[in-house]
């Protein structure tokens, strides 16, 4: 069964979102997603300072099985990317909720972020999506 930490929010596209500041979140793929992908061999990260629309494809993860788009879970600016994945894409498989994070997004308004995060799935809701 896939690990689904209670302190994160989730999308139906198998991404997790962790608030790391009043207006900032960190994004990655879930344990379920990495297990479905198989061995990750390449990660294409978004450009820093890029403005992303909610639901927009902004990154790609390539595995031995397939290539998967990664979507922005909310409208925001990309403010950091995990450069370590360029040299060690397998980190996504080994530690999807820690060292395998993909990028960080920042919004202008903390209250709006509260609302947006509230609209994402909690751990139980995500377990329902993956049949857990």
From Swiss-Prot:
GO annotation, biological process: glycine decarboxylation via glycine cleavage system
Cellular component, GO annotation: cytosol; glycine cleavage complex
Keyword Cell inner membrane set for record: no
PROSITE patterns reported in the protein's UniProt record: BIOTINYL_LIPOYL
Pfam families reported in the protein's UniProt record: GCV_H
Residues annotated as domain Lipoyl-binding: 24-106
Record-linked InterPro entries: Biotin_lipoyl, GCV_H, GCV_H/Fam206, GCV_H_sub, Single_hybrid_motif
Record text on cofactor binding: Binds 1 lipoyl cofactor covalently.
Modified residues (N6-lipoyllysine): 65
CDD domains named among the record's database cross-references: GCS_H (cd06848)
SUPFAM superfamilies, A to Z: Single hybrid motif
Reported cofactor(s): (R)-lipoate
Coiled coil location: none
Keywords: Lipoyl
Assembly description: The glycine cleavage system is composed of four proteins: P, T, L and H.
UniProt record similarity statement: Belongs to the GcvH family.
Function: The glycine cleavage system catalyzes the degradation of glycine. The H protein shuttles the methylamine group of glycine from the P protein to the T protein.
Protein name as catalogued: Glycine cleavage system H protein
Protein source organism: Nocardia farcinica (strain IFM 10152)
Gene: gcvH
